[in-house]
Amino acid sequence: MPFSEPGKTKFQVDLRRHLRNQGICDNLVHLICEIAEASKYVINAVRTGDLGVAGTSNLYGEEQLALDVLSDRIIKKRLIHSGVVCNIASEEMDEIFQAQADADGLYSVAYDPLDGSSLVDVNLAVGTIVSIYEGCNLLQKGRNQVAALYILYGPRVSMVYSVGRGVHEFTMNHLMEFTLSRENIVMQEEGNIYAPGGLRNKYQEGTEQFVRYLEEKGAKLRYSGGFVPDINQVIMKGKGIFMYPALNGSPNGKLRLLFELNAMAYLVENAGGAATDGKQPILDLEPHSLDQRAPVYIGCKADVVKAMEFVSRN
């Protein structure tokens, strides 16, 4: 069924209805709706929860915040409750959790429960990032995702998802229900915004030259320190590039392939953009471990191609 242009919708389209109109199976509809349901509890935790440390460390040796642990517990519980998930992997878990042994008709989910959680105590936006695959294998290319989404906890709570048929934004209303706000989001070929992560004095020469190129052409620096709000800005404005490059001393950058990069690359590509590690598309990278990291340049196609040109020279 056709939908009105943003701002002209005469009736509200809820998430479940929109998912069913995508022509996907009922189990996938159910799973995405369960994740959306979990976000209601996560946003309550963000608004009212403990901002202290949990006294534990994650797989990467990073000290976990209480909100990280609570958000992870909330989402994991909803995934198990869904009854359609076999394997679960989270940035906060040390290993893959098996929810069910039978893979028939089931999915596996990799997620970052609260990306940017260290920003909560200064009241900046944070988010949840989710990748969904068919079957029980989580160590596969991002190209094989059947769905990806993120939920942004900002002044508004929004959810952006794709099942390979366009990218769509939903906004949580006063009843804590997600209703359609933008459909079939398409990015421009080139942008004028850039969000550069990492310490610039550790940039390798190719990335440094690319940043100078952006500065010289008048691009605006817009970086919050949160991956979800920064990618949301690029997608919603339809222009620009986010980067967290290889650094001197950290050749693989910082961001995790399974828990952060694959989902965002899937969404950006479905919106007409591109994502690369500087050599090949993020979605074509073969994961070998849960903690694998990769550099990333993600956003408008022309900007990403230009970044690759600079990086490949050095």
Curated annotation (Swiss-Prot):
InterPro entries: FBPase_C_dom, FBPase_class-1, FBPase_N, FBPtase, SBPase. It catalyses: beta-D-fructose 1,6-bisphosphate + H2O = beta-D-fructose 6-phosphate + phosphate. GO terms for molecular function: fructose 1,6-bisphosphate 1-phosphatase activity; magnesium ion binding. One of its GO terms (biological process) is fructose metabolic process. Mg(2+) 2 binds at D112, D115, E260. Its EC number is 3.1.3.11. It is an enzyme of class 3 (hydrolase). This is Fructose-1,6-bisphosphatase class 1. It comes from Geobacter metallireducens (strain ATCC 53774 / DSM 7210 / GS-15).
